[in-house]
Amino acid sequence: MIEEGGNKRKTMAEKRQLFIEMRAQNFDVIRLSTYRTACKLRFVQKRCNLHLVDIWNMIEAFRDNGLNTLDHSTEISVSRLETVISSIYYQLNKRLPSTHQISVEQSISLLLNFMVAAYDSEGRGKLTVFSVKAMLATMCGGKMLDKLRYIFSQMSDSNGLMMFGKLDQFLKEALKLPTAVFEGPSFGYTEHAVRTCFPQQKKIMLNMFLDTMMADPPPQCLVWLPLMHRLAHVENVFHPVECSYCHCESMMGFRYRCQQCHNYQLCQNCFWRGHASGAHSNQHQMKEHSSWKSPAKKLSHAISKSLGCVPSREPPHPVFPEQPEKPLDLAHLVPPRPLTNMNDTVVSHMSSGVPTPTKRLQYSQDMPNLLADEHALIASYVARLQHCTRVLDSPSRLDEEHRLIARYAARLAAEAGNMTRPPTDASFNFDANKQQRQLIAELENKNREILQEIQRLRLEHEQASQPTPEKAQQNPMLLAELRLLRQRKDELEQRMSALQESRRELMVQLEGLMKLLKAQATGSPHTSPTHGGGRPMPMPVRSTSAGSTPTHGPQDSLSGVGGDVQEAFAQGTRRNLRNDLLVAADSITNTMSSLVKELHSGAEAEEQAGTEKTREGLPPRGTFLSVFLLHTWTKLAGCQTHSTSRERSQAYGKWGGTA
């Protein structure tokens, strides 16, 4: 008794699992019933993996399970329904890649319990065929146009006219879905639902039905159906816009823009829950956007629209012919009953007046076609046996198989009775049969080899996709080592970029110095020391970051440069200005070369010295070099003017004080 009670509780928990998960999503806080219903049914669709199955796969499953041969009012048991659902999901897993397989047993349990709760509330354990078709066709994935075409085919007669009784039955079954997710008060079935969809039309064809169902807005009782499809389309749409209420940086799904408040936009969660801020009110009209357009695209569209370049909007669906399409002729799958006696053929040939040799030639020419039909029949029968995953105990299926076997046996018996043919025909037919058997054997061998190769490749793929325990144990170590290597690489790259930047600054300063020296050296022969008509050399702009020049470090190694410059200018007019400049230039060049070598030889010492100087408030070595070059070229440029030796000595005193 205790075990039975535990099993009952487990069964009830499985039946209520989908509804418990749906309540956990808190869809009831959505204030609009249409969006609330569409969100709930979309959750059921995705949770049961029905969004992966389109309407064409559903039709194939109906035919495989023989539902297309049953009347709509026929009732099937829950076990038969479970067989149909199982075939749907097993075929789905065959189409999906190995990395995207679904849990078939869980999907079967969830969908079966949901369908029983929605369509068998009385607990009779039976559902009608039309209920199963209506529910699965409505909840499956795919295009809405294809769904509506299939639904119309189930409600129309042979002339393509919709029967209002069938439409009423479809609405009754379809509106059980909102009722199953506790939205019956908003979208429950009423007796006037049919007339609300088609109030005046008397004859409804396919195109009229599609126009009504896909209109904007659709019929009130089915307004949740197109919204559920639009939810599926915009789930992954990204809007780079900030929500005006929750201030999230971007939106996913629908975007709502107020038509009264300037640039007031809400994400779908805030709009559905009725959130508002500032001067905005829930009574304001909102426009729903299912895509994002950049301002450039909006501007181009507005210009094209104003110029009349926008193409006309395409119709929501193509126009289908009024007359329904004729069903496919599948008579070749079950061949006609063969003749029991070949005398009928002989009589027909003799009555037509054809001579006997011509009759024999025609029979010999028809033999390959007959053999091809036989082999095609065998191949189709074997394919059907291999394709059927489950054997259904349906009387129609068994009768069809018995009829097929009987006709094939009759054909074999008829061929066995044709042993009275001439020897030439028998030998020719024997050779043809032998060649056909050899060809069949070769094709079977090739098919067997191909199947073995496919199986081998599938096993290799599965083994490669499943990591071994040793690899799983080594993976953390490899990942840690890879992380350390990447961190070390980043540090080295930062170090290299810093060194390159420092080297680039020094090279720029050296290039400027050499250009100034060359310009001064080339301009000296044409400029007399006593002539004041020459233009002074442009002075470089002084950086505000250059403070007082430090009196230690690299400054000591440059003290000789200042001495050479002072010595070069101390002689006044007694020495040639050109020689003085050359001596000063050589001294500066040698000093700068030694400074560059010193900078490159002690990278770590420079960083430490730079840190100490930064703490003491002193500028780095590059700043000192800039100040030194600035003052040096100030003195060199001042030599071209008619300054007295007294002014130059004052300038030297100022230089020494600055240094």
Swiss-Prot record:
It is found in: Cytoplasm; Postsynaptic density; Cell projection, Dendrite; Basal cell membrane. Zn(2+) 1 binds at residues 243, 246, 267, 270. Expressed mainly in liver and lung. Expressed in brain, namely in neurons of the cortex and hippocampus and in the dendrites, soma, and nuclei of pyramidal neurons of the hippocampus region CA1. Expressed in kidney, namely in epithelial cells of renal tubules, collecting ducts, Bowman's capsules and glomeruli. Expressed in blood vessels and pia. The modification Phosphothreonine is found at residues 11, 69, 179, 212, 424. It comes from the Eukaryota. Zn(2+) 2 binds at residues 258, 261, 280, 284. Phosphorylated by PKA. Phosphorylation at Thr-11 alters the interaction with KIF5A. Keywords: Acetylation, Cell membrane, Cell projection, Coiled coil, Cytoplasm, Membrane, Metal-binding, Nucleus, Phosphoprotein, Synapse, Zinc, Zinc-finger. PROSITE patterns: ZF_ZZ_1, ZF_ZZ_2. Residues 521-530, 542-558 have a biased composition (Polar residues). SUPFAM superfamilies: EF-hand (SSF47473), RING/U-box (SSF57850). The coiled coil domain may mediate the interaction with dystrophin. PANTHER family: DYSTROBREVIN BETA (PTHR12268:SF22), E3 UBIQUITIN-PROTEIN LIGASE KCMF1 (PTHR12268). Scaffolding protein that assembles DMD and SNTA1 molecules to the basal membrane of kidney cells and liver sinusoids. May function as a repressor of the SYN1 promoter through the binding of repressor element-1 (RE-1), in turn regulates SYN1 expression and may be involved in cell proliferation regulation during the early phase of neural differentiation. May be required for proper maturation and function of a subset of inhibitory synapses. This is Dystrobrevin beta. It comes from Mus musculus (Mouse). The gene is Dtnb.
